Amino acid sequence: MHLKMLKSKIHRATVTGANLDYEGSITIDGELLEAAGILVFEQVQVANLNNGVRFETYVIPGARGSGVINLNGAAARLAVPGDQVIIMAYSWCSESEVREWAPVVVLVDARNRVAKVLAAEGLPPLNMTGPEK
């Protein structure tokens, strides 16, 4: 059996732009992509903290160090500049891999720069047996 697990997320990034006339996607600062281990053209889920909307799109890289989080195409209707979002990527894992699985979490500052990276070793592994007593 394989389970779809959170691979990485960019937490509480601020939307910097919206371009309705572009074909689609989300443009993300290349430094954020590298820190999160998210690849160009990888599918991501975006959760808008301001309006509760969640949607899926794919990633294109923005200039490194720019802080850009730009929604393109139809996604531009789902957030406005200034909205805070969580950008999540997922991975399929075997049941044995899940036992030691922990995602990479990238925390950003007010300018969408990497503030802190919580890598797998910084988070507890998933407890497959349920809550401890």
Swiss-Prot record:
Residues binding substrate: 57, 73-75
GO cellular component terms, semicolon-separated: cytosol
Keyword Lyase: yes
Pfam families: Asp_decarbox (PF02261)
SUPFAM superfamilies named in the record: ADC-like
Pathway: Cofactor biosynthesis; (R)-pantothenate biosynthesis; beta-alanine from L-aspartate: step 1/1
Catalytic reaction(s) noted: L-aspartate + H(+) = beta-alanine + CO2
Lineage: superkingdom: Bacteria
Pyruvic acid (Ser) modifications at: 25
UniProt-listed InterPro entries: Asp_de-COase-like_dom_sf (IPR009010), Asp_decarbox (IPR003190)
Cofactor: pyruvate
Active site residues of this protein: 25 (schiff-base intermediate with substrate), 58 (proton donor)
Gene3D superfamilies from the UniProt entry: 2.40.40.20
Sorted UniProt keywords: Autocatalytic cleavage, Cytoplasm, Decarboxylase, Lyase, Pantothenate biosynthesis, Pyruvate, Schiff base, Zymogen
Modification after translation: Is synthesized initially as an inactive proenzyme, which is activated by self-cleavage at a specific serine bond to produce a beta-subunit with a hydroxyl group at its C-terminus and an alpha-subunit with a pyruvoyl group at its N-terminus.
EC number: 4.1.1.11
GO biological process, one term: pantothenate biosynthetic process
Intracellular or extracellular location(s): Cytoplasm
Cofactor, how bound (note): Binds 1 pyruvoyl group covalently per subunit.
Keyword Nucleotidyltransferase: no
Stated family: Belongs to the PanD family.
Protein name: Aspartate 1-decarboxylase
Gene for this chain: panD
